[in-house]
C-alpha cells in the first residue's frame, strides 16, 4: 500500500478462507486491499471504491472507518465485505458498499447506498438484526459540522440487507 491513511484491519475467517482487509486513502481515492497468507489477492489489490475527502484535512476527523465483515444478505455465499466510503467533498454524502469475498457486488448491492445529507463518516459500521425481523441491518453513523456556530449533527442509519432504508435518526449536538 502506498496510501497516507490506513484503516484498522478486518479479518474474514470462514473455514479455510481467511483474508485480511484494509481500506487506504491514496491520491484522493478510497482503495481496498485484501491479503491472504502475506500476499495480495488479485481481485482486490487494490479495488478503487471512489473519491473521498483527504482524512488529513485539519477540519475533518483523522480516521478512516474500517471495513466490517458479516453475513449481510440472504445469499448462501457466507459473509460479505461492508466498505464504508466517506464523503467525496466536505459536507457531501458518505456511502456504503457491500461485496462478496471475491470482490463482486453482493446480492441487491450493485451500487452504493448513499447516506443522503448525512455528511462525513469516520466510525466503522456495525451489522446485526436490530429490528428483530431475522435479517441483518447495517448501522452507520455520519456527522455534519458547519465549521462555525451551531448546527453540528449526528445521524444514525439502519440500512436493510436488501439495500433499502430501515430507519434514520438525527441528533443535534449543540
Predicted feature locations:
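Beta-propeller blade termini
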Residues: 7-14, 19, 65-74, 80, ...
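Short glycine/acidic-enriched loop and turn motifs that connect beta-strands
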Residues: 24-29, 86-91, 143-149
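Threonine-centered tandem repeat motifs in low-complexity domains
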Residues: 24, 85, 101, 106, ...
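Inter-blade boundary loops/turns of WD-repeat beta-propellers
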Residues: 35-37, 72, 101-103, 130, ...
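Beta-strand initiation motifs
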Residues: 38-47, 104-110, 162-168
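A short loop-to-beta-strand structural motif that recurs across blades of beta-propeller domains
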Residues: 29-33, 94-97, 152-157
